[in-house]
Design a protein with these regions (language model features):
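Transmembrane alpha-helical segments in multi-pass inner-membrane proteins
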Residues: 17, 57-69, 191-201, 207-271
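Hydrophobic core segments of alpha-helical transmembrane domains in multi-pass membrane transport
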Residues: 46-50, 68-74, 99-107, 148-157, ...
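Helix-loop-helix "hairpin" substructures at the membrane interface of multi-pass membrane proteins
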Residues: 13-14, 135-215, 239-245
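Membrane-interfacial amphipathic/re-entrant helices at transmembrane-helix boundaries
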Residues: 1-20, 48, 60-63, 89-94, ...
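Transmembrane helix-bundle core of multi-pass membrane transporters
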Residues: 85-86, 91-162, 189, 255, ...
Length: 293
């Protein structure tokens, strides 16, 4: 049962990466921007939930909802102040700005909450499900994380494919100029995309710290990088690709730690990404696009 236990742990970790990667893939798919501050929004969401539930003793669901609301507003503010003025700027300017926003959020967290590790109280009730006569034990937080990822992906696929606003997002991703001529509010659509991505980051932050209950101002940095890797792995711009990339990345990381080396697990994850991109540059589910000159 050890193999199955590692597999489930990998799927759970990968589900967290997938939820974060969905934020990257939606922002890139619609706005064609890489928001490297996304990982730090994860940290903000976790801190908001922690203070809401531990310090102000709000119910867990209220803490999660408050984290989502705060991060959603934060995402809109970041887009309006940092990224909107740079839509016509070179990609290097956008990347430098994203890194600057990331460091700003980390240092603001240091000022507000200090660098001391905080023990995060899980929003998921403690306990586990035993299978095969107790040979396999699955914590509730693992089940909730996997279920949350599946539900979020299904909702996003439905939203982007069936709703008016979702179709507006798809139109903007294809051609912003044509979408604007058709009466679509491009600025509002991009802001909504950042809001959704940041709300997902809050959920991912709460789930991440519920599973690994140590919270510091740099909590979201490495998961953010790995989730970006997952988005590229699966095909950035593709919602199913983000989920597939995240889950595969989580499985690879857990098995690398279990059977190869804990120290080399991150190197193995990024090495697999390089191999995939050499073989299929658009990612596993990404579309190969040829531009005519």
């Amino acid at each position: 049962m050890t193999f199955l236990s590692f597999l489930i742990s990998g799927i759970s970790l990968g589900s967290i990466y997938a939820i974060i990667a969905l934020g990257y893939t939606m922002v890139y798919g619609i706005a064609k921007m890489l928001n490297f501050a996304h990982g730090d929004v994860i940290m903000v969401g976790a801190y908001i939930c922690f203070y809401a539930t531990s310090r102000f003793e709000l119910p867990a669901i209220a803490g999660v909802l408050l984290a989502i609301v705060v991060c959603t507003i934060l995402g809109i503010v970041i887009e309006r102040l940092a990224y909107k003025p740079l839509r016509a700027a070179p990609i290097l300017a956008v990347l430098i700005t994203a890194i600057g926003v990331s460091y700003f959020l980390q240092n603001a967290a240091l000022l507000l909450w200090s660098s001391n590790p905080t023990v995060f109280s899980s929003v998921v009730p403690e306990g586990s499900v035993s299978l095969f006569g107790g040979q396999l034990t699955i914590p509730y937080v693992t089940l909730v994380t996997i279920a949350a990822c599946i539900v979020i992906v299904l909702v996003l696929v439905w939203f982007t494919g069936k709703t008016k606003m979702g179709k507006a997002m798809r139109a903007c991703s294809e051609d912003k100029g044509a979408a604007q001529l058709m009466g679509i509010n491009v600025n509002g659509t991009i802001s909504l995309t950042f809001a959704i991505g940041s709300g997902l980051a809050a959920i991912a932050g709460v789930l991440l710290c519920s599973a690994y209950p140590t919270l510091v101002p740099t909590t979201g940095a490495m998961p953010g990088i790995k989730a970006f890797t997952a988005a590229v792995f699966g095909g950035i711009g593709s919602i199913p690709g983000a989920m597939l990339g995240g889950v595969l990345l989580g499985i690879i990381e857990i098995f690398a730690k279990a059977y190869i080396s804990t120290q080399l697990s991150d190197a193995i994850v990024f090495a697999v990404l390089i191999v995939v991109l050499v073989v299929r540059p658009a990612g596993l589910l990404g579309k190969q696009v040829r531009e005519k000159v």
